[in-house]
Amino acid sequence: MTWSTYSATRTRARPEDVWRLWTDVAGWSRWDDDVASSQLEGPFAVGTGGVLTPRSGPTIRFVLTHVEPMVAFTNRASLPLGTLDFIHTLRTGSGSTVVEHRVEMKGPLTFLFRRLVGAGIARSLPAVVERLGRLAEGGVP
């Protein structure tokens, strides 16, 4: 079973400005209000793990499963019998940058975790992406 949610924003920020914020894992709470703290346990590269503590809920471990500098990255958390992928992508054109965040949940218990965590993620994702875009433009998140 699979569940996903998606949000995007167009910003005047350069891709490297967004990338800098994404790769500053300890600073994720600056643009994501659901994050109390986060840290990466090594370089921003495929296979590196990290820890994220949400404002509500248990601390979760994640691993970077895809890193394409200035273009995209994915961090994956494990769920019982499943996975939770946070997919971040940049697209450029017409003098702007499109910041996309997609969250995909997979596994036989998705029906349960969709209700427990998915609904909150879907609710907050548009504001998270908007704050990231404003911060990348040099504004206040």
Identify the role of each PLM range.
Residues 3-5, 58, 71, 84, ...:
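Residues at beta-strand starts and edge strands
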Residues 78-127, 134:
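Beta-strand/loop substructures that line and gate deep hydrophobic ligand-binding cavities in soluble
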Residues 30, 39-85, 108, 130-141:
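Glycine-rich portal/gate segments that line the openings of hydrophobic small-molecule binding cavities
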Residues 1-39:
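Hydrophobic ligand-binding cavity/cleft-lining segments
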Residues 16-19, 126, 130:
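Amphipathic alpha-helical segments that line or abut small-molecule/effector binding pockets
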